[in-house]
């Protein structure tokens, strides 16, 4: 069901893409194990960097690693020393040449992984879990591309002896709709009472060939103008924008005009006969 499965895996090939792009026959299991080791290496040493996603692409003799982070300065380090260290560790792990790309995340409040990591950090600092969840929801809903969010915490909440799960939701989060763009993030908070799992679902609208989202985001100048049924525009009188027949005075003036015209036409022949 859509409520239980990972939203990324549920929508692979529909609205989401694979985070590891390579092909192998006999070395498939080795590459999968290596990808897990690469992501674990980047997650353990760069907790403060705010890594949202890691994409891996392989060729015959090269491995390309794209790191999407909210704080690229921490990953790069002073004069690139941290990036060089990470590249050396990855080359030692894979035994191949590594191309490291560090990409900045523009809106970290709308990335589910970063939101989950932020809530987990607050729980580790003894912040009340309800306050942390509501603060994350409020900051995410301020983003224009976020239409709904759900945050769930599971574990010994508040130091209780029995573990439980609580979640808060705002907006729409259609987990069973395949065309829905759902971003999912998971992070664990280490507290004195044990680990608390934080899950975040963010709904960013539907993807139907990209037509609906592009039409909504198009500026007003690019949208087609609606033509009027008649070629001429109605005449307006005054600065208030009223037409000639929209007021009592205007209707009276228009009704008196034909009568005055007929009276003038009737008087004209009479004057000519008298002369």
UniProtKB/Swiss-Prot annotation:
The molecular function GO annotations come to: mRNA binding; rRNA binding; structural constituent of ribosome
InterPro entries xrefs: KH_dom, KH_dom-like_a/b, KH_dom_type_2, KH_sf_prok-type, Ribosomal_S3_C_sf, Ribosomal_uS3_bac-typ, Ribosomal_uS3_C, Ribosomal_uS3_CS
Biological process terms in GO annotation: translation
Residue limits of the KH type-2 domain? 38-106
Q: Write out the GO cellular component annotations.
A: cytosolic small ribosomal subunit
Q: Which UniProt keywords apply?
A: Ribonucleoprotein, Ribosomal protein, RNA-binding, rRNA-binding
Q: Which CDD domains does this one have? A: KH-II_30S_S3
- According to the record, the residues making up region (Disordered) are 215-275
Composition-biased stretches, type Low complexity, lie in 237-275
Matches recorded under PROSITE patterns? KH_TYPE_2, RIBOSOMAL_S3
Subunit notes for this chain? Answer: Part of the 30S ribosomal subunit. Forms a tight complex with proteins S10 and S14.
Q: What does this protein do?
A: Binds the lower part of the 30S subunit head. Binds mRNA in the 70S ribosome, positioning it for translation.
Further information in the entry reads: Binds 2-aminothiazole antibiotics, which are antitubercular agents.
The record ties this protein, via PANTHER family, to:
30S/40S RIBOSOMAL PROTEIN S3, SMALL RIBOSOMAL SUBUNIT PROTEIN US3C
Q: Which family does it belong to?
A: Belongs to the universal ribosomal protein uS3 family.
Q: What name is this protein filed under?
A: Small ribosomal subunit protein uS3
Gene for this chain: rpsC
